[in-house]
Each structure stands twice: as structure tokens, then as C-alpha cells.
């Protein structure tokens, strides 16, 4: 059963833990599984696939390439991107806050 907080965030009980960029999530299955626990109840909230070294290497490579584009992006466009991120956080603040 999926925990209500995960449902509110559009997540399932089992999730890939690593976003690789370019709309791609890691499919690594041999790096282990993380099981976050509610410290109050001891309940496992969900399962998150751990990341491999190859995942991390790819993320760093893509992040470095993305930074080269980001640093040449005009400030107003960067500001708009940050505003959209903040808007998404505000939209989900109650569910995100319950994870803390």
C-alpha cells in the first residue's frame, strides 16, 4: 500500500531514486534499496532504489554540461526557472512538510 504522503506527491510505493537528467530515471536495480522509516511509527514509507557509481558519474557529467548552458542563460530566464521551482514547492508544501 502506498503511503498517503507519497500519493499526494504523485509517487508510488517503489521509486527510482536517481534522476539522470534528460527526462531519464535510473533503472539500476543492483545498487540496493533504501527504505525510509517513519520514526514515530516504525512504518516503512516506501522503497527507493539506490544509485550506482555509474549513475553518479553520468549525473556529474550531465550537470557539468547543463551548467555551461545555465551560465549563459539571461538572468530573467534563470529567474523564471527558479520561480517555477518555488511555485512547485509551494504547491506541495503540506506533503513535503510532513516528511520533515
Model-identified regions with their sequence ranges:
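Terminal low-complexity tails and localization/encapsulation signals of metabolic enzymes
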Residues: 1-47, 80, 84
Amino acid at each position: 500500500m502506498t503511503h498517503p504522503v507519497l500519493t499526494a506527491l504523485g509517487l508510488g510505493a517503489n521509486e527510482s531514486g536517481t534522476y539522470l537528467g534528460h527526462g531519464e530515471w535510473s533503472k539500476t536495480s543492483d545498487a540496493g534499496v533504501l527504505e525510509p522509516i517513519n520514526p514515530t511509527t516504525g512504518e516503512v514509507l516506501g522503497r527507493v532504489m539506490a544509485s550506482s557509481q555509474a549513475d553518479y558519474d553520468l549525473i556529474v557529467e550531465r550537470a557539468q554540461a547543463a551548467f555551461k548552458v545555465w551560465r549563459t542563460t539571461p538572468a530573467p530566464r534563470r529567474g523564471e526557472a527558479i520561480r517555477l521551482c518555488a511555485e512547485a514547492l509551494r504547491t506541495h508544501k503540506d506533503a513535503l512538510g510532513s516528511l520533515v
